[in-house]
Amino acid sequence: LFEPNSLYSPIMIEREISPRLEALYSQYPFVTVTGPRQSGKTTLCRAAFPDLPYANLEAPDVREFAETDPRGFLARYAEGAIFDEIQRVPDLLSYLQVQADEAGRNGMFVLTGSEQFALSDAIGQSLAGRTAILRLLPFSFDELARTDASTLVDDVLYSGFYPRIHDQHIEPRQALGDYFETYIERDVHSLAEIRNQTSFRRFIRLCAGRVGQLLNLSALGADAGVSQPTARQWLSVLEASYIAFQLPAYHGNVRKRLVKAPKLYFYDVGLASHLIGIEATGQVATHPLRGALFENAMVMEALKFRLNRGRSSNLSFFRDQRGLECDLLYATGEGTIALESKSGATFAPDSFQALDRVAAAVSEVRHEAVVYGGDEVQKRTRGTVLPLAELSGWLGEMDAGA
């Protein structure tokens, strides 16, 4: 039933979140790592804590034991353990709380889960104040560069960042197709009773075709052939399972009338590419949504930078009613960074014009950067020009608190 973790020794790309995970383990009785399926949660935790025993609660026999005899199950783990997919047995959390409270020490249990909201609710009821929570997304650009995978922009927009694709050299079209089918068959069923699978599949593909756009649930639902309340429910399912992400609009103290609707992105740009029908790297360059996919990759790279350091999202976008827009505002304790994405490999000097106007409207803006599809860092008078691959390192310089 149970695997001794000492036998687990995968070849692993070191994840940027590892130091934070290890530090928090010494400060809390529990650390909970959540994130998409196949983002590397199990590999991360088992490699970080090789001396902890491991149990996968998705295995039917393990789950049955934990559900029917929780005290007997936990008796095997008096000194702590890694429990994978803890949301499958939410009632176990109350028993874990008692066991950890009786032990009275930090560094006991590491929990993983891939259902964002259900897991948060369960933890809030049983482990409030006792667990640190980390979110692990697929590889960042820097992590991808540690593999032998291509980091050319079009290759990345096609293949995405799921570790399994790059660790095991799986054809992205096959891997992402399998991921999507497994998601529909397993996760969607556990999260919601969706009767019309055909409409739901259409809905997901429509969402992928709208990355980087303002979210309009009425239009999205109409195109999918469902009501607005149904579209809202289905989008919440995509968010709960780490498929889709809503970037909030900036609502600071400015005199302009601002757009309030969020923008829609996918946690993995490769999955979005797959769902809009891209089947090879060569199709990316001429695809009409290439710019939106590049913007998606930029936003996720900034989000991964935060989450990999144990920080919450500090991201928003700016758009006023007259169309003045900035793709991404990144707030820090020392001011805000305004970022614009330009997927072309050649930098156009007028790219800073809109950023300058946004900086004039948003007094907190201290730095401006254009993230583009080229490969050269350029320090300009008005700001910095960055390749996508350099964004994380540059944010590290700008955000001293991260």
Language model features with spans:
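Pre-Walker A adenine-sensing motif
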Residues: I11-L24
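Hydrophobic anchor at the beta1->P-loop junction of P-loop NTPases
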Residues: V33
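Conserved lysine of the Walker
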Residues: K41
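Hydrophobic positions on the alpha1 helix immediately C-terminal to the Walker A/P-loop
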Residues: L44
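Conserved catalytic/switch belt of AAA+ P-loop NTPases
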Residues: L93-L111
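Short regulatory helix/loop adjacent to the ATP-binding pocket of P-loop NTPases
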Residues: F117-A132, A149
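Domain-level recognition of nuclease-like catalytic cores that cleave nucleotide substrates
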Residues: D148, G373-A402
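Accessory nucleic acid-recognition modules appended to NTPase machines
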Residues: I170-T336
